[in-house]
A protein has these predicted regions:
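Glycine-aromatic micro-motifs
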Residues: 1-139
Length: 139
């Protein structure tokens, strides 16, 4: 069975409201942090991860790293997640991420669902933590 690596950073994480969508066949790989700091995260009732416009347009890394979880998922699980995420306006995007406790290790490539464009002003949120240029959604 062709499985895929899925990077989740919000409601699909352990303890998140949609975690059950991953089902019993998904294998937790670990907690990972994106290699590049070209992302941002906003709280719009649920978290959205997007490419930081300034970092993208200027080809500079001025955004944030994102902490999330990587799962090894079945095609059926990926189809369920894709349906949910794409219906909510997200698009699949390949991210490279390293294991949180082993940053010098080989990064993994995984599919993340990100918001395709900037989402207005980020008013901040008590559910998004920021420490050492890493953002994380805390359910």
């Amino acid at each position: 069975v062709d499985r895929s690596l899925l990077f989740v950073y919000g409601t699909l994480k352990k303890g998140g409201s949609l975690h059950s969508v991953l089902g019993n066949s998904s294998e937790f790989v670990g907690t990972y942090i994106t290699e590049e700091n070209k992302y941002d995260m906003h709280d719009v009732g649920c978290p959205i991860m997007l490419i930081d416009n300034d970092s993208y347009l200027l080809n500079e890394s001025k955004g944030f790293h994102i902490r999330g979880e990587i799962y090894n998922v079945t095609p059926e699980c990926m189809e369920r997640v894709t349906t949910i995420e794409c219906n909510a306006g997200y698009v699949p995007f390949i991210v490279e991420a390293h294991e949180e406790n082993y940053p010098e290790g080989e990064p993994l490539k995984a599919i993340a669902f990100i918001y395709p464009h900037a989402y207005g002003h980020n008013a901040g949120s008590h559910r998004i933590t920021e420490k050492e240029n890493i953002k994380e959604w805390v359910a």
